[in-house]
Amino acid sequence: MTKLTKFDSIDILMKTLSSYVSNDLRESLKNNKVVTLSVPGGTTPAPFFDYLCNEDLEWQRVNVLLSDERYLPEDNIRSNARLIAKHLIQKKASVARMISFYNKNLSEEEFVIKYESQMSTLLPINVSILGMGEDMHTASLFPDSDELLDALKSDNTLHVVRPKSQPEARISLSGKALASAHKTYILILGENKLNAYKKACSEKTEINAPIRVVFGSNTSVFWADKI
């Protein structure tokens, strides 16, 4: 069963998550030459990244993989890669290798075709951090995306998705790629997200609640109120 842990403050949550993730990475590095850390975009995890980049571990052996990305240049204010470079690929973690999902010379579909085999070599994910929307999406696996079923069920690592609720096309890790993680942490804040998580627990299918693709004994949910 997926475990829910509630924290008294956002800061305590972020510090604790940083400690857990760094310890998981150290354990993974004992048995692997390189490891894969999958991370989300958005503003919510920025304080966590600020703590994690100061953790002592062999960052030069860590591949930082985006869970999803808007197909935009990396200097665009809405780019997940931009946020991760600003908050995570800093200080002790500056030597980590970040893998982004953008090539100005390729369309979204061309990018996926060209880089699918390369991205698949980064699996399984050793440690994954995910967010979740109030619609129960995770990464860019949105319930209102026509590509959702294929992204959940196919063997590919990458998928182009065009959610009706979003202004840009996105590239997302597939359900199979996300579910490959040895350890997953879902980071959510506020009562609305907590209620969405509870609703996801009661749903029967991943189509209605894509976050369910990572539910299981290796997944922990960290929650704090926004107040």
Where are these regions (language model features)?
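Glycine-rich N-terminal segment of FAD-binding domains in flavoprotein oxidoreductases
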Residues: 29-53
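Glycine-rich beta-strand-to-loop/alpha-helix junction loops that act as flexible
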Residues: 39-44, 130-134, 189
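ATP/nucleoside-binding phosphotransfer catalytic cores, i.e., glycine-rich phosphate-binding loops
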Residues: 182-227
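N-terminal glycine-/serine-/threonine-rich phosphate-binding loop
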Residues: 1-37
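A short secondary-structure junction signal
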Residues: 112, 139-144, 196-200
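Ligand-binding beta-strand-loop-alpha-helix segment within the catalytic cores
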Residues: 60-129
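Short, conserved loop/helix-junction motifs that constitute active-site signature segments
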Residues: 55-63, 92, 176-182, 214-217
